[in-house]
Design a protein with these regions (language model features):
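Short cysteine-rich loop/turn motifs with clustered Cys
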Residues: 1-13, 37-39
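Short recognition patches in nucleic-acid-associated and regulatory proteins
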Residues: 11-25
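Polybasic, low-complexity binding patches
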Residues: 21-32, 42-85
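Short, exposed beta-strand "edge-strand" segments with a Pro/Gly-rich flavor and a Y/T-containing core
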Residues: 29-36, 73, 100-105
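Helix-turn-helix DNA-binding helix
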Residues: 92-95
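Short Lys/Arg-enriched helix C-cap and helix-to-coil transition segments
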Residues: 97-122
Length: 122
């Protein structure tokens, strides 16, 4: 049973920090998923709620920080990206289409931006 990361309530819902519409390649990435109760997921102040920008930003910033810690070298191969994100071969190929390739490797910054749906949280 999964508990809400905000309040600890059981029977929580899966929430994609980076929405599927922002980066489909991360649909199955475990680090892109958090569990939120119905109130914190779809309620007024939840990421899908009318006033949920603050929580949405907080969750995205936490994910971005994880990406920065995880991708700590300058360049990565497609296999390294796949391993670090824990995603399928097809998903990493899809992600790689969003990133400029330099001599068969991908730049750390470009990987992070692609994983964040094209924009960094400042």
């Amino acid at each position: 049973m999964k508990e809400c990361v905000i309040c600890g309530r059981p029977n929580s819902e899966e929430h994609h920090v980076i929405y599927r519409s922002e980066c489909r390649a991360l649909i199955k990435c475990k680090k892109n998923l958090v569990y939120l109760c119905a109130d914190h997921h779809r309620g007024l102040y939840g990421p899908h709620g009318k006033c949920g920008k603050e929580l949405n930003r907080k969750l995205k910033l936490e994910f971005q920080n994880w990406l920065e810690e995880t991708f700590n070298k300058d360049f990565y191969s497609i296999e390294e990206i796949k391993g670090k994100l824990g995603i399928s071969t097809n998903a990493v190929k899809s992600l790689s289409k969003l990133i400029r390739q330099k001599n068969s490797v991908f730049d750390r910054e470009d990987i992070i931006i692609a994983c964040m749906g094209g924009k960094r949280i400042l």
